[in-house]
C-alpha cells in the first residue's frame, strides 16, 4: 500500500498544477480567514507547497512543517512571497520536535482530510501540546457534505482524491477535537457545505 509520504513525494512536482483550479476558484478567498486575529509565533502544520505563505501577516514568525521533503522543497521556493519570517522543517505532525507551549497558535489547511482516522487524535494532541495554554488552533478542512447532490459528486471524485492525495471526505475531525482535550470555539462552513473552518482553543 502506498504511504502518505510516498504519495506526496510522487505528486509534489504536479501538486500546484493539479490544484490550480481549486486554489484560484476556492482556496485563495478563504485562506486569509485562518490568520484573522492571530499573531506571534505560529505553526503551519502540513505546510505543503506553501500555499498559505502569501497570507501570513507581516508580524508573524511562522514555522512550516511537512512529512514530505519534496513538498517542502516547493515551499522553499515560495518563501519569498511571504511578508512574515518563515522557517521550514521536515517533521511528522504526530511527533513534533518542539517543546510544550512553543507556539502562540497553530494552523493546518487540508491536513486532517489526509491523515488516517487513527492519526487524527494523536495529531490534535501534538498540536495541543506545542501551542501555549489558551492559544488557538485553526483548521480548514473538507467535511462530508449534507446535500445528496454533493455527496454524489464527491463519490465520483473520491477514488482519484484517495489515490493521488490519500484524502478522504469522511474524516470527522470536529468530533476528534474534544477527544484530544480541545475546545471548539467556532465551526463554520466557508465553501458551501464542503469546507469548514474550525477554531479551537487549547485549555489553560
Ligand atoms: C493536501 S496537502 C495540503 C498542503 C497545504 N497545507 C495547502 O493548504 O495547500 C497535505 C499536506 O500534508 C502533508 N502531510 C501528510 N501527513 C503528514 C504528517 N503526518 N505530518 C506532516 N505533514 C503531513 C503532506 O505531505 C502534504 O504536503
Where are these regions (language model features)?
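Short alpha-helix
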Residues: 165-181
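A short glycine-rich, Lys/Arg-flanked "PGG" loop and its adjoining helix->strand segment in the class I
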Residues: 121-133
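A short SAM/SAH-binding and catalytic strip from SAM-dependent methyltransferases
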Residues: 105-119
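A short acidic, Gly/Pro-enriched loop at the edge of an enzyme's catalytic core
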Residues: 94-106
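Core SAM-dependent methyltransferase catalytic element
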Residues: 181-204
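Conserved beta-strand signature within the Rossmann-like core of class I S-adenosyl-L-methionine
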Residues: 134-142
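Conserved alpha-helix/loop element of class I SAM-dependent methyltransferases that forms part
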Residues: 21-41, 51, 55
Amino acid at each position: 500500500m502506498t504511504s502518505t509520504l510516498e504519495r506526496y513525494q510522487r505528486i509534489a512536482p504536479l501538486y500546484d498544477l493539479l490544484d490550480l483550479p481549486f486554489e484560484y476558484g476556492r482556496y485563495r478567498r478563504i485562506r486569509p480567514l485562518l490568520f484573522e486575529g492571530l499573531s506571534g509565533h505560529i505553526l503551519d502544520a502540513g505546510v505543503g507547497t506553501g500555499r498559505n505563505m502569501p497570507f501570513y501577516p507581516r508580524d508573524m514568525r511562522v514555522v512550516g512543517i511537512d512529512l514530505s521533503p519534496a513538498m517542502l522543497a516547493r515551499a522553499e521556493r515560495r518563501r519569498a512571497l511571504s511578508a512574515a519570517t518563515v522557517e521550514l522543517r521536515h517533521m511528522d505532525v504526530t511527533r513534533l520536535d518542539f517543546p510544550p507551549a512553543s507556539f502562540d497558535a497553530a494552523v493546518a489547511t487540508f491536513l486532517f482530510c489526509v491523515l488516517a482516522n487513527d492519526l487524527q487524535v494523536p495529531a490534535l494532541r501534538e498540536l495541543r501540546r506545542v501551542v501555549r495554554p489558551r492559544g488557538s488552533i485553526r483548521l480548514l478542512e473538507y467535511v462530508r457534505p449534507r446535500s445528496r447532490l454533493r455527496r454524489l459528486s464527491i463519490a465520483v471524485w473520491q477514488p482519484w482524491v484517495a489515490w493521488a492525495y490519500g484524502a478522504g471526505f469522511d474524516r470527522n475531525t470536529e468530533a476528534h477535537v474534544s477527544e484530544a482535550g480541545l475546545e471548539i470555539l467556532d465551526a463554520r462552513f466557508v465553501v458551501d457545505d464542503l469546507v469548514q473552518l474550525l477554531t479551537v482553543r487549547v485549555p489553560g
